[in-house]
Each structure stands twice: as structure tokens, then as C-alpha cells.
């Protein structure tokens, strides 16, 4: 693989100096000729991301784009060869036929040249021709793919090659391959959530669960990649959210939308954040972003988001909110009060309805088990505990600038409290 990369890089590296040599006119100043080549190079480099990245990727697939580029390149090569030396060079019939044949081969074999490319990149050494994505959606915001699962579980979703959830909406253990019980925590945290904001959509399972709670009258969803809406159409468990009149969708960046809508306030903000170590995730878990979200919460409002097991994120949240509670890898934060009464949590959970039937079926042991676990989980405030962990493990306060969430927090080897000088002083 490395040899092939080296060879390709070597061949690409030859292009510019060869152009500078052959395209320099002998009857004019060399500097002028070379400057034109540089200008064309800069123009093409700037136009490439704009035309391909922002336009073509939005209207067609990667393999089609590669075919378009190949055809344009070959036509450009033919034209350049023809006009070189004022058209004095005459191509033989055999050369013309060979060139046309190559173009036709590339044109009709293009769909096979990149067949299974995304699967090869994803599975790497484990790739086989049997491993295929069940859905692939490409646009300028990224690549969304899904894989089918065994055992009756919901399909897995991958955004940019990383796990991004599943389509499961049922909390029972034999179906719950995405820990969707975390979404059912919403009314066990806030006593009366009426208006909800979801930052991120993915496969729609979380928004679908929120829509099953009848007391929620309004749901605003911010999703930067419109491809997820197309994907949701294909899955009946979640596609009812596309026709739910309570739900409004905004294709935008979460932070930008919040800044542009300072008057919007919600009872509940939900954010199923991606892995804390991924590129740019710092912008969704920093103290500045949490402060921005706090401005969009009503009195006693709750923000509930995925810390993905990062110890730095709960600690950062304690510097913005008075109360911080943990459920699995999620944290709930508020300046008000979280529900502490199990009876209230149970009453609210019983309101979840799907297809005119309660979500939690007490005649089903697994459904009853999921219900009981949600009811009995305490919403204990861990703020003081987080401060203790900070002192012990040197947790980081995540800011927009320090990228602390994207790097592992190491355990502090040296502790001043355990220094030899202090020990012998006693």
C-alpha cells in the first residue's frame, strides 16, 4: 500500500515541473509563462473544493464525480495535445483509436472501479465482498451508511465511518442495541417537559422516543447533515417523526443556530453527542457552549447530553450548572431540581404511548425490568464528587480553545499531598 502511495505521489509530483517546462513559450519572457501556470494552478486549487466539494458532492455520488473528473481530464489532455505547437502534431489513426478506446473503457467501467470503496475503507483487513452497506447517502456534509444486523436487532448507523446509533426505539433488553432507555429518562428528569430542543438527529430514534411522550407539544431539531432525513424515510420505526406536526427541522450547525435564535427557550435540551475524542467535538462540550445552551433553558430547564464516558465533561458541566446527575454515559444538568420522587418518575413513564398502546408492557418481563430500572435510578447530584475527582485525577475544564475533550485525561502520577517531604514532616 505504501509503495503504491509513493508511486502515485511521485507521478503527481512530476506534473507541475513538466508543465512548467513544456508550456513555457520560447518567444516570450519565461517569468510570464511560468506565472500563467501558477495562476492556473491556484485557480484550479481554489475551484476544486468549491465545484466538487460544495456542488458536485451535493448532487451526485463519489464514483460519478470521479468519472466526471476523468472524462474532463482526458478531453482536456486531447485538446491541449491538439493545440500544442499550433496543431502541427498529427496523431496517427492507431493513437486516436487507442485514446478513444481508453475513454470508452473508463466511461463504461466507472461504476465498477469504485465498487465497494466505502466498505473497504470501513472494514479494512476484515473486508469481504459479502460485507456491504445496506444504505449509503453522500453529500457535502459527509457520508452516512448503515449495516444490517443479526438476531432481529435494528440496523446500525455510521456517520463519517463512526458509529452513530441505530434505529431501535424499544427499551427492552432483547431489542435495545443502542441504549435507547437513556432517551426514556427525559420525563424522569423534568417533571413537565413541554418544549424540547434536540441538537442532532442521526437516525431519529431519540426524537421518535421524545415524540411518544404526549405532554411534549413542540420539538425543534437541529441537524447539520440533511442526509439523515432521507435515511429516516426508509425506516418505518422512526419515519413517523417526518409527519409529526409538533416537530420542526433546521438544517444548521447547533451553535450557530443557538446564536441566531437568542429568544428561543426550552424546557429540555437533548444532545446525543458523538465520541468526546472526535475532531471538533470540543465545540459541543466546552464551557462556552454549555453557557450558551443555558441561556436557552427556561426556569428549571434541563439539558441532557452524552458525555461518552469522558471524566472531563461532567466536571466542566459543574462549572456552569448547579446540579449534575449521571445516567450511564449521559449527564443531566440544571439550575433547578431534578425529579427525586420515584412515584413521579413512574407516573411520567407510564405516559409513553406508541400506536395507542403503552410503551411499557408490564406483562413483558423485559419491559417491566426496563421500566423499574428507570424508576429506581436516582438523580443524585454529583457536583461535589466531581470536584474531588478533579483534585485526584487532574481533570480538565474544557474550553473552546484547549481541545481537552479530544485528548485522554491521564491519571496524575505526582501528588503534592503524598510528597515525601510532607510524609516525613509528620
PLM region spans:
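A cross-taxonomic marker for long C-terminal extensions/tails that follow the last structured domain
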Residues: 375-377, 382-404
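Alpha-helical transmembrane segments of multi-pass membrane proteins
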Residues: 1-347, 396-426
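Surface-exposed polar/charged interaction patches
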Residues: 351, 355, 377-380, 399, ...
Amino acid at each position: 500500500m505504501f509503495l503504491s502511495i509513493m508511486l502515485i505521489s511521485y507521478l503527481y509530483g512530476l506534473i507541475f515541473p513538466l508543465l512548467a517546462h513544456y508550456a513555457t513559450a520560447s518567444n516570450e519572457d519565461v517569468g510570464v509563462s511560468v506565472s500563467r501556470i501558477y495562476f492556473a494552478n491556484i485557480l484550479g486549487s481554489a475551484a476544486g473544493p468549491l465545484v466538487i466539494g460544495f456542488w458536485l458532492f451535493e448532487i451526485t455520488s463519489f464514483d460519478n464525480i470521479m468519472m466526471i473528473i476523468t472524462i474532463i481530464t482526458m478531453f482536456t489532455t486531447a485538446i491541449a495535445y491538439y493545440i500544442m505547437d499550433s496543431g502541427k502534431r498529427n496523431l496517427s489513426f492507431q493513437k486516436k483509436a487507442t485514446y478513444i478506446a481508453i475513454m470508452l473503457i473508463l466511461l463504461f467501467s466507472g461504476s465498477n472501479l469504485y465498487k465497494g470503496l466505502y466498505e473497504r475503507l470501513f472494514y479494512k483487513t476484515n473486508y469481504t465482498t459479502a460485507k456491504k452497506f445496506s444504505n449509503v447517502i453522500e453529500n457535502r456534509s459527509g457520508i452516512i451508511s448503515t449495516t444490517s444486523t443479526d438476531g432481529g436487532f435494528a440496523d446500525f448507523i455510521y456517520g463519517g465511518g463512526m458509529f452513530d446509533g441505530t434505529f431501535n426505539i424499544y427499551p427492552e433488553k432483547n431489542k435495545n442495541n443502542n441504549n435507547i432507555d437513556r432517551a426514556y429518562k427525559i420525563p424522569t428528569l423534568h417533571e413537565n417537559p413541554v418544549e424540547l430542543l434536540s441538537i442532532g438527529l442521526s437516525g431519529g430514534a431519540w426524537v421518535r422516543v421524545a415524540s411518544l411522550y404526549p405532554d411534549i407539544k413542540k420539538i425543534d431539531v437541529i441537524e447539520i447533515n440533511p442526509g439523515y432525513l432521507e435515511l429516516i424515510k426508509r425506516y418505518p420505526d422512526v419515519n413517523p417523526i417526518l409527519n409529526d406536526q409538533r416537530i420542526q427541522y433546521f438544517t444548521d450547525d447547533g451553535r450557530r443556530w443557538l446564536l441566531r435564535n437568542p429568544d428561543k427557550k426550552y424546557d429540555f435540551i437533548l444532545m446525543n453527542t458523538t465520541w468526546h475524542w472526535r475532531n471538533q467535538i470540543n465545540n459541543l462540550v466546552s464551557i462556552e457552549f454549555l453557557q450558551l445552551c443555558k441561556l436557552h433553558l427556561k426556569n428549571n430547564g434541563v439539558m441532557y447530553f452524552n458525555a461518552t464516558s469522558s471524566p472531563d465533561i461532567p466536571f466542566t458541566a459543574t462549572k456552569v450548572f448547579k446540579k449534575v446527575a449521571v445516567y450511564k454515559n449521559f449527564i443531566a444538568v440544571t439550575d433547578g431540581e431534578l425529579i427525586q420522587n420515584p412515584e413521579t418518575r413512574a407516573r411520567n413513564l407510564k405516559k409513553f404511548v406508541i400506536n395507542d398502546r403503552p410503551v411499557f408492557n408490564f406483562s413483558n418481563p423485559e419491559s417491566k425490568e426496563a421500566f423499574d430500572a428507570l424508576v429506581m435510578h436516582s438523580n443524585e447530584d454529583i457536583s461535589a464528587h466531581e470536584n474531588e475527582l478533579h483534585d485526584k485525577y487532574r481533570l480538565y475544564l474544557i474550553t473552546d480553545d484547549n481541545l481537552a475533550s479530544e485528548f485522554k485525561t491521564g491519571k496524575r502520577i505526582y501528588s503534592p499531598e503524598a510528597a515525601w517531604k510532607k510524609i516525613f514532616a509528620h
